[in-house]
Amino acid sequence: MKKHLLFWCILFCNAAVAQTFSGGTGTESDPYLISNVNDLKELSNMTDTPGADGTQQTYGKFFRLTQDITEPFVGMIGYEGFFKGDFDGGGHCITLNINMPTDNYVGLFGTVKSGAVHDLAVSGSVVGCNYVGGIVANPTNEALLYNLCNYADVKSTSTSMLSCVGGVIGGIISKAEGTMQGATVSCCANYGNVSSDGCALGGVIGYSGQQTGNTISDVANYGFVESSNSKRIAGTIGNPMWNDKVHRIDRKSTRLNSSHRL
């Protein structure tokens, strides 16, 4: 009898720590299904909590958004950890209300490390300090970002030389990684307002700083980029690096109140 009770206790405890999404098993053919704010919270917890063996729980896992989420999401995915899986937005939109004015690396996704985020839109508002992006604050180490659209207002409270604020992406930084390859960003657009009194602001990407360079193509800004500072402000990429591979940037649509380079 005691053995049976022990068995059921172990089974219950294991079930308690398992991920509880709207469906799926996390494989490519059967991704975890994200349908509501509770699912986003579950993904946030999964991203910030290491597995039993100390590994990143989202590594090799697949997630798919099944519908628009109109209830504002106030949290972040990857606040303490980083996202290393594949997030397929399915062409849907997530409404955000992220207000973290004293925190760095703020966005729907904080850090995406060797992961992928694609086919997703966000709306609402995002407020942070340094490295603030509507969708991803900091993609790094071969992160793959494509088919992304930001409609949210993105604001940085920082006045630093590297506020790194972008409608879609805050700052691409991996200098400490040395030999790691840069991020790939393609088919991304911003329609939201981007503002800060600091430097390195862009409608799509605030700062692109990676020793090995990033690949950026087919990006456009249709929003307003505003700063009282006149340095490193641009419609699309606030601070591109010399070794970035940049192709097909739409600059004609940009509205600025400051000087810009790209």
Regions found by a protein language model. Name each.
Residues 256-262:
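Positively charged, low-complexity/disordered segments
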Residues 8-10, 14-15, 46, 68, ...:
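Low-complexity, intrinsically disordered/propeptide-like segments
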Residues 1-19, 140:
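Bacterial Sec-dependent N-terminal signal peptides
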Residues 19-255:
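Surface-exposed repetitive/solenoidal architectures
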